[in-house]
Amino acid sequence: MAASEKISDIKSKGTAWILGVLAAISISIVFVLSQWWGREPQQFNILESAISQAGLTASTPAEGEGTEGGEGEHGASTETASYEILAADLPLGYTYSATLAHIADTLLNKSGGYITNDVAPPGVLLDNITSWEMGALVMLRDASTALRNHFSRDQSQSGEDPDLAIAEPYFYYEPNSWALPATEAEYEKGIQALHKYMERLRDPSKGKKAQFYSRADNLWQYTEVVIKRLGDLSTRLSSNASSSNFAPGLTNLELEEASGKVAAKVGWMEIDNVFYEARGASWALLHILRAIKHDFHDILLDKRAMRTVDIMIRELENSLTPTMSPMVLDGNGYGLFANYSLAMANYIARANAAALDLRDIMNRG
């Protein structure tokens, strides 16, 4: 009797030990995957991306050029010049469209793939990167809508491009659908339709010639949307501060009178999601603005608005500075700890101020 109890006790302890080891291994795997999948994607070169999608190849520097002492600034400048030469052969609007396709592709194929619709660990636990994806997705949707409704149409009475009419709705598919159909499958269809539009931009023989109009009124209409997006992000980022609201030149009372209500305070458990949503939106908008700077180059020079776009780009670049803490710090005033959300709100507010200037410049005759 005692012997059987002893054997049973040993078996139960062995089972518990095995289960404990398996649990420790599982937790370790989930932790490692969480660190890998939770990384924000790196920035990319919009010209290099457009050239790659067009099937062009950058020329290699001749022997002796960019080799000895060429690595570094000279090598980088040579490579950039090579991209600019090749990009000059691309039709107007190709770089902008290729940038949207690259942003969508990054959402699907970054570390861990698209995570918002995951139903199992570790993806279901990663709320920061899912917020990042939502921020980037909103900017992608706005830019694809602008391409369909404004940039590709000559007048309000003009017919819309057939491929863009297919591409845009796919990007508006619900972001958290796991299956039947999966979100990734729908977004992939949007990318494919966008590529068909890009092919017709380069080669009219592949169907009805695609159009892209880089006009001031088109850019003005898109800038209106950007202003609203940035304003919303700036307000939500700063709403957890002691002053409850943040806007240059406005007091709390003036803000309440202007909006007609008191802005809800975002709690500490939610502000990290808003912070990463703003990071994702800034990442996507940064690349879109670089593409606009390229494809709207002539109109921006003519309107003397190039510096305004550069200010927006610089502030968004600053907003993407790597954080030193694994947690979103929520300090106050001149306290010991930084306040990441207020720092981000400051950069976005300055980018929004430049967007207001850009809208006014584009709206002038």
Regions found by a protein language model. Give the residues of each.
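N-terminal positive-inside, membrane-proximal cytosolic segments immediately preceding the first
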Residues: 1-18
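Hydrophobic membrane-insertion alpha-helices, especially the h-region
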Residues: 17-32
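A cross-kingdom marker for long, charged
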Residues: 31, 35, 39, 44-54, ...
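N-terminal Sec/ER secretory leader and immediately downstream segment
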Residues: 48-186
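Amphipathic, non-membrane alpha-helical segments in soluble helical-bundle scaffolds
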Residues: 94-97, 101, 130-137, 157, ...
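A cross-kingdom feature marking solvent-exposed beta-strand/loop segments within repeated
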Residues: 117-128, 181, 262-272, 325-343
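Extended amphipathic alpha-helical interaction segments
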Residues: 184-313, 320
